[in-house]
């Protein structure tokens, strides 16, 4: 029994609102029977009449307790299965059982009534009797007669005269089957109910129920005017039944009969007898009240079942009517005239609005819906049905949102809570079974103007949101659970129509439920259960991502936040001890859909107080459920991706197929699948009522949106950190124009995520730009008709007011201006508003700051604000109102208030967490605080929904498009966005948990993530998860391996088997684990741990990795120190671990990984080989100090090479690029065992590979055999190289016919072997090569191996280890050339290209000789090679053309002397000094002589190359080696003298130019530059006297006190520069000598043109002038001495005198060879060049003082003697012409002291001849 003080819940025609929206249609649900409750109650009455059974006994037995009625459904099964028995314990189960009993009980009931009661279809086909009555009418008469007879027997009835007379009147009419007025029956029942006798009322109600089942009362029959306001008999009877009992405690049988009668009316299927509108609602309300106030649990259960059935029937009728009319009716045009008032105006944002207050006090255009009876559409069945459906749903929603006081919340059995629960359950049932009707766009209201054009979902939209927002955070578990189910339906079936609302509920309700610390376990658990059901639907998950995470307008990344929130549950919270019976927990945690409504009667087990909180569950159970959610998400994503890939690979477009599959059928119950497509096509477009439209998802578009959204978040975060930088970044990414303050202000005003403190500081800044933005920002606010305090509150909700007074001042100034502009009559001027605003802010701080003890009083506040209104006072009442308002309601940020309100849910309590104290007695403060926090969460959600619906209503938001998921490409970005929380959720249990099921879930999750990452090439994610798994194997510490570690290992092996094609670099981690596993297996069978080092530990030690660094993930698991490893040796491997790791499953898994490599893709097998090579190398290096290193991975490498040998060449080439490099490494490893194993394996592979036929012009064999060449070229031991030669020899012997491109590599092996210093290797190489030359020469020539063979023999020749082999090899080269020469001569008959012939056959031999000449170590070999080379040039070169000689000269002859070219720098010469000296003294001399012979013999063909050969000789002459210079001089002289007669003018021009260029290049011009010697640090400085003394010695030696000048202080650069200048001075002297000697040769002088001699003479003159200038610069020479240029005073006296002597000698010789009296231009030029210079030299010599210039005097004496002698020998005419030029110079010589006798004699002769000439001249004149 209920508390009589509790109010009875009445259900008036509650007002409603609607938000128009469209959706697609679901599949139709099967219809449910509609007469079961009435029938069971009828049966109860019959049995009671006959046997005296209590009313409702059957219902009681079937609805409560453990008593279950066994009902025979058919002859095959006479009892219910346990599942069916369980189902019968719910109202839905009762309905099903009642339907099954209907058929059985019809016969029994009809026998009792004596007249059969046919169903509606039977009644429609009955034939009328002769009396004019149908069988149905006769049955009703029988029922009425029986009723009258029962009433007659009751005294109370007979005492009522009117009633008595009426019964006496009716009985004969009924018996005679005459027609009569049905109102008489109504009047009779009215009398019965007026009697207030339970017995009479029960008989009446029983009869009415039977008449109602016969559709006896019709809505067409009207009551007479005398009866009151006109209404139908049907309405009259329903009202009469409803009014028969009141809300006080009444007899239970009477309540049951009322339920039976109302159920009969509601379930009646006759059109005219159906209940609609208010009549229907009145009936439902009475059933609802009976459920609440029922006399017993049985009655309440029956009422609940009847209520459920009534609601079901309403929607079944709607479905049936719509199905019938849908085929003929067209989609009507929608009416956009609907307006909503559910959301309050934005002008009152500070008013606390809840959905409860809206429901109770709000008015809307839908709250007073009027039905136009004259509209024909109203009378249609479909329109009546949709109106009934809407009204019933609206009523349930209004009941569900009624506010419940806290004390009632704690009492789950109170009427208020039971009313809320049944309403919520009915709402859920309606949405679950009829979601397709709600979204069907063809099912629309037509008869109600306010609803015209709306669908059910549009009309019901706001009510669904209302229900959830008010109840979703309820602390009552039962309420919270059913709200979760409703929200799930919203997401599952209605998500396209509730896009924004779903985001709100996720953000404001369900995410906080998981994130907040002190929400109850019940709330967290049921939240997780619903999330799990969502996670099972791949389409729903993808659509959450693309519609929220990729939507720029969405403030919440729902999918991403979903993963972050559920992952927190796994990582937060204390760890609790797990009980041993943990296996029994999981079934209770399984996700189960609500398949039936639980009993909600007063004493129902579902309302027991102990289930208010799930105190038996702990954090562990929540973590298990969270883990299951993560696993379901991953499974859904994987299924969606794989299905999409499958379709795409088949060439099927996912857009065309819809890409639906079976994913929407995620539920395991019969929940209808809501497809967002209607009849396979998109159902509708966005319209004026819809807040969302449906579109298909384009992956590229969403990727762009996601990136832009992420970038915007980054910019906003940057702004929150540094506003100026943030705005710059926003501008750079085109989110806002940084030069437009208005655009900036609008962005800051509307953008989500802006930190309000930062925003306030920025707006308060004093720079011009910030002020402009602040002004525009405040202008975005509207203060029209707002009170001043409310306006200030609105302003301060936008940002946090900065603390600096100047910033506040600027903001308040603008606020005051804005307020007064929009409210000009509020104050006298803006100054008043400014002062008052500032005063209010100070008041708010004073009143609410805890640090201020003495608070401001109201009088103080009024006093402070006197005279501010333009000198006048503001009204004191107004100021007092302001004071009171601030005192009661602080001006504070809503965010702060909301945070403070939910603080009880965020902070840890000292007692039990959450709402577990609800079961305790008294009003606990903690419980109250938590209830208030929940209320605040509800209010916040309501406020957000209010704002959202306001925007939708007023069009302030763009049409919100909802995108259907059709592409699998979204899965990759989804995983990229959420892999970190997934990793955290899955990794945490692997660290500590030993629970097998939990570990299996984690490992399944890892496997799914890797699968998805592999499908979409997400390398970072794949590597992160695989590395994490490898870290959990614990193979580095064998003694600590546990069951969970073995499970991880098996998971890694499964991943390797299933995802091999996409693992890429992750193969390294997996193969490392396999290597470690093999090591552990060896340890398990008794091998010493020290004999099998761990590759991870070795790698860490080798690389010295810092474990704390972020890039050492790979090495974390192996980061054990040496001491740790030592300790582990003392702990043996556990037998359990050995058993697991050596199990057949593990062994077969490893084998399968390697054997399946043949099926890997081309790129995957390359990655596999690369990883295995790296692991093998780690094994080898880690055990390099052992005698027997680890070769496990190397063996596997060879093994899989055989498996993959048959791959196509393109793939094998890629494999060998990796494998070949690895064999290079291991084949040359310093450990002999490794190298031998590798080479032997390579030999076997090569033998196998050579069996594969290779076509010409391919190089697979060449590349495959490269490792042999690499090993031979390495520094490995001789034994390994011997093995290489043996392997090569074996391959040649066995497969010589198969070898093609491999010859090049094999000869490469021989070439490197020929370079070795080992006699054995050289001997083996020579023997093999000789055998090839003698036995297989033709084969080699066919394979174009000539060059390779010559190179090998050349290397043998160059190697000086064995002279005999070198000489024999040189002889073989000669034989090769002889063979080639014969072949060339024989082949010339076919006239092949001469150039091609020489290039292919001759040049390789020439190059071999050249290489030997240049590089051979043995001098005899060099000499013979040179002889052979020049023998070919001299004797075998008849067929050489000029082009051939040009090539030969440039490639073979000139390079021999390249060491003397400019490219041979000084450093190279110094390093090779000993070698060069040997070369110079031996080969070079012979080469130069041979070269001169060649030039002489083949001059005709080499004539055009003369310049090159002259350059060669000039380089040889100009070396600083005297021997070379002499050889060069001799060769040059021999060449010119021997071929002078062949030289043409152009050739002599080359010779002259060569000498001129040499003189220029060797002139040390830097000697004359003082800045060259500016760095004289540390050099000695002479005194002035010493300098004077030295200055008088022009070329003399050092003074007597000689100084030893050290050059250690001179920089190396200066020293090199000094040496270069000295070398040039020496070369000048050498050039002068060369020219002199060359032109002394009469053969040369006679053939060289005089013009070219003059050119050389000019160069010699320049040399003389340079030396002269240097010698005369005394200060420069002293400076050179001071800086350490030389150890004595430098001079160029020899160059000066030698060049002067050569100069005059050549000119006098030219005069002799020409006509003495010639007047040609050349003659005149010679005269000008000669005689003035001679006079100059004579004058200079005459000026020399013998005592001071003794050396100079002696040096110049030969020059003067030559001049005088040459003058004397001039012809008379020429002598006479130049007397005036030379006479006075000779006169000056006479006065010279100590004149040499020779010169004295020459002067004497000169003057004698002059005298003779002059005397003869005078005599002639006389």
Swiss-Prot record:
Residue(s) carrying Phosphothreonine: 597, 654
Chain spans, region Disordered: 1-54, 66-126, 1111-1131, 1584-1610
Main subcellular location of this protein, as a coarse class: cytoplasm
SMART domains per the UniProt record, alphabetical: Sec7 (SM00222)
Domain of life: Eukaryota
Bias-annotated ranges (Polar residues): 72-84
Motif HUS box boundaries: 547-551
Composition-biased stretches (Low complexity): 1117-1130, 1597-1610
Basic and acidic residues bias spans: 85-110
Localisation: Cytoplasm; Golgi apparatus; Golgi apparatus, trans-Golgi network; Cytoplasmic vesicle, COPI-coated vesicle membrane
GO cellular component, one term: COPI-coated vesicle membrane
Domain SEC7: from-to ranges: 701-889
KO phenotype (gene knockout): Sensitizes cells to tamoxifen (TAM).
InterPro entries per record: ARM-type_fold (IPR016024), DCB_dom (IPR032629), Mon2/Sec7/BIG1-like_HDS (IPR015403), Mon2/Sec7/BIG1-like_HUS (IPR032691), Sec7/BIG1-like_C (IPR046455), Sec7_C_sf (IPR023394), Sec7_dom (IPR000904), Sec7_dom_sf (IPR035999)
Region: HDS1 domain, residue numbers: 898-1106
Alphabetized UniProt keyword annotations: Cytoplasm, Cytoplasmic vesicle, Golgi apparatus, Membrane, Phosphoprotein, Protein transport, Transport
Gene Ontology process terms (BP): endoplasmic reticulum to Golgi vesicle-mediated transport; intracellular protein transport; regulation of ARF protein signal transduction
Keyword match Protein transport: yes
Modification Phosphoserine, positions: 44, 122, 125, 653, 669, 1110, 1606, 1609
Protein purpose: Guanine exchange factor that acts as an activator of arf1 at the trans-Golgi net-work and is thus involved in vesicular budding and traffic between compartments of the Golgi apparatus. Activation of Arf (ADP-ribosylation factor) GTPases is essential for vesicle formation via recruitment of cargo adapters and coat proteins necessary for Golgi trafficking. Involved in the resistance to tamoxifen (TAM), an anticancer drug used to treat estrogen receptor (ER)-positive breast cancer.
Free-text domain note: The homology upstream of Sec7 (HUS) box is necessary for the allosteric activation of Ssec71.
PANTHER family in the cross-refs: GUANYL-NUCLEOTIDE EXCHANGE FACTOR, LD29171P
Name the record gives this protein: ADP-ribosylation factor guanine nucleotide-exchange factor sec72
Native source species: Schizosaccharomyces pombe (strain 972 / ATCC 24843) (Fission yeast)
């Amino acid at each position: 029994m209920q508390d009589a003080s509790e109010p009875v819940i009445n259900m008036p025609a509650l007002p409603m609102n609607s938000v128009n929206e469209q959706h697609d249609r679901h599949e139709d649900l099967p219809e449910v029977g509609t007469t079961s409750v009435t029938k069971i109650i009828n049966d109860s009455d019959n049995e009671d009449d006959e046997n005296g059974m209590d009313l409702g006994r059957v219902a009681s037995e079937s609805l409560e307790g453990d008593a279950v009625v066994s009902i025979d459904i058919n002859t095959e099964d006479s009892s219910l299965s346990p599942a069916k028995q369980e189902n019968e314990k719910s109202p839905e189960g009762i309905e099903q059982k009642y339907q099954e009993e209907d058929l059985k009980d019809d016969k029994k009931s009809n026998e009792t009534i004596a007249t059969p009661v046919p169903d509606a279809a039977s009644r429609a086909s009955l034939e009328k009797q002769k009396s004019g009555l149908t069988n149905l009418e006769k049955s009703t008469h029988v029922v009425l007669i029986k009723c009258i007879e029962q009433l007659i027997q009751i005294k109370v009835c007979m005492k009522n005269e009117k009633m008595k007379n009426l019964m006496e009147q009716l009985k004969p009419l009924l018996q005679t089957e005459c027609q009569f007025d049905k109102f008489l029956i109504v009047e009779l029942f009215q009398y019965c109910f007026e009697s207030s006798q339970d017995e009479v009322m029960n008989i009446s109600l029983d009869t009415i129920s039977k008449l109602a089942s016969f559709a006896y009362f019709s809505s067409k029959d009207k009551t007479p005017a005398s009866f009151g306001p006109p209404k139908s008999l049907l309405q009259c009877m329903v009202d009469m039944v409803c009014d028969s009992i009141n809300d006080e405690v009444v007899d239970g049988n009477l309540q049951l009969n009322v339920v039976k009668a109302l159920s009969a009316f509601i379930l009646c299927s006759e059109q005219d007898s159906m209940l609609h509108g208010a009549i229907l609602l009145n009936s439902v309300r009475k059933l609802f009240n009976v459920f609440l106030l029922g006399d017993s649990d049985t009655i309440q259960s029956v009422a609940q079942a009847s209520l459920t059935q009534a609601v079901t029937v309403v929607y079944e009728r709607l479905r049936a009517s719509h199905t019938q009319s849908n085929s003929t009716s067209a989609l009507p045009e929608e009416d956009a005239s609907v307006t909503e008032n559910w959301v309050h105006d934005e002008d009152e944002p500070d008013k606390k609005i809840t959905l409860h207050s809206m429901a109770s006090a709000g008015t809307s255009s839908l709250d007073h819906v009027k039905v136009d009876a004259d509209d024909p559409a109203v009378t249609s069945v479909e329109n009546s049905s949709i109106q009934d459906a809407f009204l019933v749903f609206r009523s349930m929603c209004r009941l569900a949102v009624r506010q419940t006081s806290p004390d009632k919340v704690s009492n789950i059995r109170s009427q208020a809570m039971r009313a809320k629960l049944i309403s919520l359950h009915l709402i859920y049932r309606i949405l679950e079974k009829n979601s397709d009707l709600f979204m069907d766009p063809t099912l629309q209201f037509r008869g109600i103007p306010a609803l015209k054009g709306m669908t059910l979902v549009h009309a019901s939209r706001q009510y669904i949101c209302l229900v959830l927002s008010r109840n979703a955070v309820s602390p009552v578990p039962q309420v919270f659970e059913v709200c979760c189910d409703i929200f799930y339906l919203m997401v599952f079936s209605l998500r396209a129509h509730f896009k924004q609302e779903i985001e709100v509920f996720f953000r404001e309700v369900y995410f906080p439920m998981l994130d907040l610390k002190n929400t109850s376990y019940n709330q967290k658990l049921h939240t997780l259960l619903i999330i799990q059901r969502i996670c099972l639907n791949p389409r729903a998950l993808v659509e959450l991502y693309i519609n929220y995470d990729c939507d720029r307008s969405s403030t919440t990344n729902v999918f991403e936040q979903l993963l972050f929130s559920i992952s927190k549950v796994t990582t937060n919270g204390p760890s609790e001890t797990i009980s041993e019976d943990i296996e029994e927990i999981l079934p209770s945690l399984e996700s189960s859909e609500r398949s039936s409504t639980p009993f909600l009667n007063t004493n129902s087990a579902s309302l027991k107080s102990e289930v208010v909180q799930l105190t038996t569950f702990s954090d562990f159970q929540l973590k298990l459920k969270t883990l299951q959610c993560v696993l379901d998400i991953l499974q859904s994503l994987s299924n969606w991706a794989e299905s999409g890939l499958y379709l795409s690979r088949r060439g099927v477009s996912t857009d065309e197929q819809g890409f639906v599959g079976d994913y929407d059928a995620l539920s395991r119950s019969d929940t209808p699948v809501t497809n967002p497509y209607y009849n396979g096509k998109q159902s509708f477009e966005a319209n004026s009522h819809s807040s969302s439209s449906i579109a298909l998802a384009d992956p590229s578009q969403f990727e762009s949106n996601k990136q832009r959204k992420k970038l915007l978040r980054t910019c906003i975060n940057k702004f929150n950190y540094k506003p100026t930088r943030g705005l710059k970044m926003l501008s750079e990414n085109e989110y806002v124009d940084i030069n437009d303050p208005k655009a900036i202000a609008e962005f800051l005003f509307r953008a989500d995520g802006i930190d309000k403190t930062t925003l306030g500081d920025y707006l308060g800044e004093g720079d011009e730009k910030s002020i402009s933005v602040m002004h525009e920002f405040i202008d975005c606010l509207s203060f029209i008709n707002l009170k001043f305090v409310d306006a200030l509150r609105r302003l301060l909700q936008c940002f946090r007011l900065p603390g600096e007074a100047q910033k506040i001042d600027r903001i308040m100034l603008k606020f005051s201006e804005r307020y007064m502009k929009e409210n000009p009559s509020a104050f006298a001027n803006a100054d008043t508003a400014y002062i008052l605003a500032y005063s209010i802010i100070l008041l708010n701080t004073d009143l609410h700051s805890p640090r201020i003890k003495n608070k401001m009083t109201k009088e103080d506040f009024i006093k402070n604000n006197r005279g501010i209104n333009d000198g006048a006072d503001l009204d004191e009442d107004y100021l007092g109102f302001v004071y009171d308002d601030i005192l009661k309601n602080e001006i504070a940020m809503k965010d702060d208030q909301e945070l403070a309100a939910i603080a009880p849910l965020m902070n840890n309590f000292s007692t039990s967490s959450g709402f577990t104290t609800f079961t305790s007695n008294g009003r606990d403060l903690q419980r109250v605080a938590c209830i208030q926090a929940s209320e605040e969460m509800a209010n916040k959600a309501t406020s957000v929904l209010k704002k959202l619906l306001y925007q939708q209503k007023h069009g302030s938001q763009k049409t919100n498009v909802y995108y259907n998921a059709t592409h699998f490409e979204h899965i990759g970005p989804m995983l990229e966005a959420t892999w970190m929380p997934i990793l955290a959720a899955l990794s945490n249990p692997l660290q500590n948990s030993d629970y097998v099921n939990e570990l299996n879930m984690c490992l399944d999750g890892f496997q799914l993530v890797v699968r998805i990452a592999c499908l979409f090439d997400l390398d970072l994610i794949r590597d992160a998860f695989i590395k994490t798994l490898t870290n959990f194997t614990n193979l580095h510490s064998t003694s600590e391996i546990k069951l969970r570690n073995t499970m991880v290992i098996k998971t890694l092996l499964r991943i390797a088997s299933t995802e091999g094609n996409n693992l890429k670099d992750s193969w390294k981690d997996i193969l490392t684990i396999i290597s470690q596993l093999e090591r552990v297996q060896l340890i398990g069978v008794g091998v010493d741990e020290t004999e099998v080092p761990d590759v991870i530990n070795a790698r860490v030690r080798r690389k010295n990795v810092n474990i704390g660094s972020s890039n050492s993930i790979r090495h974390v698991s192996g980061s054990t120190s040496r001491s740790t490893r030592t300790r582990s040796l003392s702990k043996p491997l556990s037998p359990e671990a050995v058993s697991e790791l050596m199990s057949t499953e593990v062994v077969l898994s490893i084998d399968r990984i390697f054997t399946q490599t043949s099926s890997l893709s081309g790129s995957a097998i390359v990655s596999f080989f690369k990883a295995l090579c790296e692991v093998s190398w780690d094994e080898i290096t880690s055990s390099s100090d052992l005698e027997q290193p680890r070769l496990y991975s190397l063996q596997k490498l060879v093994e899989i090479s055989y498996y993959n040998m048959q791959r196509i060449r393109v793939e094998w080439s890629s494999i060998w690029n990796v494998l070949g490099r690895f064999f290079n490494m291991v084949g040359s490893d310093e450990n002999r065992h490794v190298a031998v194993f590798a080479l032997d394996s390579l030999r076997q592979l090569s033998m196998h590979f050579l069996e594969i036929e290779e076509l010409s012009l391919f190089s697979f064999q060449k590349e495959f055999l490269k490792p042999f060449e690499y090993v031979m070229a390495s520094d490995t031991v001789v034994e390994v190289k011997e093995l290489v030669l043996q392997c090569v020899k074996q391959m040649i012997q066995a497969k010589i016919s198969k070898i093609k491109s491999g010859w090049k590599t094999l000869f490469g092996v021989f070439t490197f072997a020929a370079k070795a210093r080992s006699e054995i290797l050289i001997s083996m190489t020579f023997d093999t090569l000789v055998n090839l030359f003698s036995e297989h020469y033709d084969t080699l020539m066919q394979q174009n191996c000539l060059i390779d063979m010559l190179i090998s023999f050349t290397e043998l020749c160059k190697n000086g280890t064995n002279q005999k082999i070198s000489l024999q090899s040189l002889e073989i080269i000669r034989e090769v050339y002889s063979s080639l020469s014969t072949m060339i001569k024989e082949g010339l008959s076919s006239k092949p290209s001469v150039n091609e012939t020489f290039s292919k056959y001759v040049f390789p031999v020439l190059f071999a000789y050249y290489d030997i000449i240049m590089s051979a170590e043995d001098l005899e070999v060099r000499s013979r090679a040179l002889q052979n080379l020049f023998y070919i040039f001299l004797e075998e070169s008849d067929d050489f053309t000029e082009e051939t000689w040009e090539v030969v000269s440039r490639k073979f002859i000139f390079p021999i002397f390249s060491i003397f070219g400019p490219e041979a720098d000084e450093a190279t010469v110094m390093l090779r000094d000993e070698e060069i000296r040997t070369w110079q003294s031996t080969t070079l001399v012979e080469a130069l002589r041979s070269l001169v012979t060649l030039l002489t013999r083949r001059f005709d063909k080499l004539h055009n190359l003369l310049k090159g050969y002259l350059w060669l000789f000039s380089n040889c002459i100009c070396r600083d080696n005297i021997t070379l210079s002499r050889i060069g001089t001799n060769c040059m002289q021999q060449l010119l003298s021997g071929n002078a007669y062949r030289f043409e003018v152009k050739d002599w021009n080359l010779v002259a130019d060569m000498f001129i260029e040499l003189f220029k290049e060797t002139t040390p011009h830097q000697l004359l530059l003082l800045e060259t010697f500016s760095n004289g640090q540390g050099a000695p400085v002479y005194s002035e006297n010493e300098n004077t003394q030295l200055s008088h010695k022009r070329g003399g030696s050092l003074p007597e006190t000689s100084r030893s000048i050290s050059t250690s202080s001179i920089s190396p650069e200066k020293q090199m520069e000094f040496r270069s200048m000295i070398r040039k001075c020496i070369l000048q002297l050498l050039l002068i000598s060369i020219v002199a000697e060359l032109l002394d040769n009469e053969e040369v002088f006679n053939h060289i043109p005089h013009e070219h001699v003059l050119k050389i003479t000019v160069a010699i003159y320049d040399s003389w002038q340079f030396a002269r200038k240097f010698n005369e610069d005394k200060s420069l020479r002293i400076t050179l001495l001071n800086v350490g240029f030389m150890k004595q005073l430098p001079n160029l006296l020899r160059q000066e005198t030698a060049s002067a002597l050569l100069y005059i000698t050549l000119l006098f010789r030219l005069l002799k060879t020409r006509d003495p009296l010639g007047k040609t231009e050349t003659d005149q030029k010679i005269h000008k060049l000669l005689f003035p210079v001679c006079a100059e030299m004579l004058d200079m010599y005459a000026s020399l003082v013998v005592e001071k210039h003794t050396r100079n005097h002696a040096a110049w004496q030969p020059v003067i003697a030559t001049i005088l002698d040459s003058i004397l020998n001039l012809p008379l005419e020429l002598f006479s012409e130049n007397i005036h030029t030379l006479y006075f110079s000779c006169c000056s010589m006479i006065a010279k002291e100590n004149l040499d006798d020779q010169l004295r004699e020459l002067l004497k002769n000169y003057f004698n001849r002059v005298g003779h000439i002059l005397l003869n001249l005078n005599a002639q004149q006389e």
